[in-house]
Amino acid sequence: MKTDILIIGAGLTGLTTAYTLASKGKNVQVLERMERAGGQIHTHQEDGFVYESGPNTGSISNPEVAELFIELEKVSGGKCKLETAPDAAKRRLIWKGDQFRALPSGLGSAIATPLFTLGDKFRILGEPWRKKGENPDETVGELARRRLGKSFVDYAVDPFLSGVYAGDPNTLVTRYALPKLYNLEQNYGSFVRGAMKKAKEPKTDRDRLATKKVFSAVGGLSNITDAMSNYLGDRITLGIKNLKITPSGNTWIATYTDRDGNHQTINALEVITTCGSYVLPDILPFIEKSEMAKINNLKYAPMVEISVGVKNTNGLDYKAFGGLVPTCEHKQVLGILFPSACFTGRAPEEGALFTYFIGGVKHAEMLEKSDSELTTIVENVFHEMLKFPSKVNPDLIRIFRHQNAIPQYEITTGERLATVEKMEQKFHGLHIAGNLRDGIGMAHRIKQARDIAQKLT
């Protein structure tokens, strides 16, 4: 078989790349080792609950997200529709002491909040005049302590990074993990001053598509990947094994075993990988081991994700995006999302759906706990932290383990990015994509895919 462009991986990045290229008339083929398309995105429906076993939400942080939804609603016949969270979901909670407390959303609440010390509240007034950092590899924790103070690290930065990266603020490097924050200081000298100036910058109509709203799809995120996989049809091959890619003159040869055990070959002009870095040594054997080691130096946070549903909340109402738990509070969960407060149809009418996140880089051992042990944690948190009375118990508990859940953009990132660029220049037609670069969120994945497709059309 011959194709213009071969894409490895049928997750969000791979499907978005393939769909965009195919919609522009390019001949594409997608290879996927799993027996289903969608990658980590997987929506489940059970007993009145609609829950995710991978990503739960995204943010419309770039126009590409909005543009993709506009297209997919058309090609899916209305089956894929954007759903954004209500204003109530802007409320974010942080656990301190014995309860969840709202993260400040304005000057008044910032002054009154018990989350931060009085000293750090005064300290933040001087943030616009603090000296700009000089270490390009400064961690998020170091940067936040220097500009904001320890209590802001403990009760804002640390839980935020637990929620996004399941990571450690003292190892995540700011310019890779939070490049927008890094650029505020570097370009404007201050977070506060930079945010104010950015807000005043003129925006085009396309810029305004990036509303920053929390999003899903009506009925769940699988409707996004299903819309693209249905559009692509037999251009996706599932259940492949033993994939090897090798350069051959100005083209590429991919060999693999299909689900029936037959040996197959594809000849392509361009190859795009969208899989995790840990897969690359096997599928790109032509890259020297010393160079591949620099690409494959990426650490992933392990994660246990647990969907917890209750059919009748007995009047308890959580109108917020979710609650995050600082490391210093020594709880067994990193955070809890409230999907039924954000999106329609996620729980029965009188019920609620929660998503617990457990583990991360600081507590990788949680992945080894049995279902019984994790269920005990779920029930304890349900009563102690979510404040359900003892007579009310979860009606749904579904446990999902992810060994390689979230890439950690640590000090090794610079070497990895440089090596990826070097390999792409050395081997014409090779594109190494996926969440090993350019951001981990769904919006990052969509933008990377659209950018690659734009470059190849």
Locate the predicted segments by residue.
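Conserved Rossmann-like nucleotide-cofactor binding loop
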Residues: 13, 36, 278
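Glycine-rich FAD pyrophosphate-binding loop
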Residues: 22-46
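Dinucleotide-binding Rossmann-like beta1-alpha1 core, especially the glycine-rich loop
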Residues: 47-131
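Active-site/ligand-binding neighborhood in enzyme catalytic cores
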Residues: 126-245, 251
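Mid-domain catalytic core of redox enzymes
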Residues: 240-354, 361-367, 384-385
